[in-house]
Design a protein with these regions (language model features):
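Disordered, low-complexity tails and leader-like regions
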Residues: 156-160, 172
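A short macromolecule-binding patch
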Residues: 97-108, 167-190
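Non-catalytic propeptide/linker segments at domain boundaries
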Residues: 103-120
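Beta-loop motif signature
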Residues: 1-84, 115-156, 194-195
Length: 195
C-alpha cells in the first residue's frame, strides 16, 4: 500500500490488490458520499462543505484505488463489481471489504480494468524493472525504477510503456519498453501516480 493522501483527519492509501471487475470514479451531486455496509447500515458518510469535509464515523484510514479528499484535487475512485445503470447499488471495495453506494446519488464513470490502466500514468517499482530493446538485445533498465510512463499498449499482463513527455511527474528519462503489470490479482506497478 502506498500513501497517496494525508491530512489531519484521514490517511488514504492505494490498494496493491486488484479487486472486482473494474474501477468506478464517483462525482458528487449533493456534496456528500455515503458508503453502506452490506447490511444497509452506514459505514461512513463524508460531507463536503466550505472547502473542507466531515466524517460522520471518524474513519481515519482509507484503502481504495484513489481517494483524495482535498477539494482542489478531489478524487473518489474505488475498485468495484460491474454494475448496470438501473442497479440500485454499486458494490465497491474500501479497506479491503465489499461495501455499497446508492447508484442514483452520484454521477458514476465505470472502467474495466484494462481501460482504467490504459489511462493511468505508471510508475515502475523495485524488482519489476522495464525491459528495453537495445542494439545488443533485451535488458532491464535499472534507471527505470521510480520513473513515470504512459501506456502505449496492453497485451495480457504486459504493458508497453513510453516515458512521459507531457511534463507530468517530472519525467526526465527517455525510455520505452515492456513491464509485467500484474501477477494474478497483485499489482506489480504503481497505477496511482499523483503529480
Amino acid at each position: 500500500m502506498n500513501l497517496i493522501y494525508q491530512d489531519e483527519k484521514v490517511s488514504s492509501y492505494t490498494d496493491e490488490i486488484i479487486r472486482g471487475s473494474g474501477v468506478v470514479e464517483i462525482q458528487l451531486i449533493k456534496n456528500e458520499l455515503t458508503i453502506f455496509n452490506l447490511d444497509d447500515t452506514v459505514y461512513e458518510k463524508i460531507t463536503f462543505k466550505n472547502d473542507s469535509y466531515y466524517l460522520e464515523n471518524s474513519l481515519s484510514e482509507i484503502v481504495a484505488r484513489k481517494v483524495i479528499l482535498a477539494m482542489d484535487f478531489l478524487s473518489l475512485e474505488f475498485d468495484c463489481k460491474k454494475f448496470e445503470e438501473d442497479d440500485e447499488f454499486v458494490y465497491i471495495f474500501i479497506n479491503k471489504e465489499l461495501m455499497k453506494i446508492k447508484n442514483n446519488n452520484y454521477k458514476l464513470n465505470y472502467y474495466e480494468w484494462l481501460d482504467y490502466v490504459a489511462g493511468c500514468y505508471i510508475k515502475i517499482l523495485r524488482g519489476n524493472l522495464l525491459l528495453i530493446q537495445t542494439e545488443y538485445g533485451e535488458r532491464y533498465a535499472h534507471n527505470s525504477e521510480d520513473a513515470i510512463f504512459s501506456v502505449k499498449e496492453i497485451v495480457d499482463d504486459k504493458l508497453f510503456l513510453k516515458s512521459t513527455s507531457t511534463g507530468c511527474c517530472v519525467a526526465t528519462k527517455n525510455l520505452e519498453g515492456v513491464v509485467t503489470w500484474r501477477e494474478g490479482d497483485k499489482l506489480l506497478v504503481d497505477i496511482c501516480v499523483i503529480d
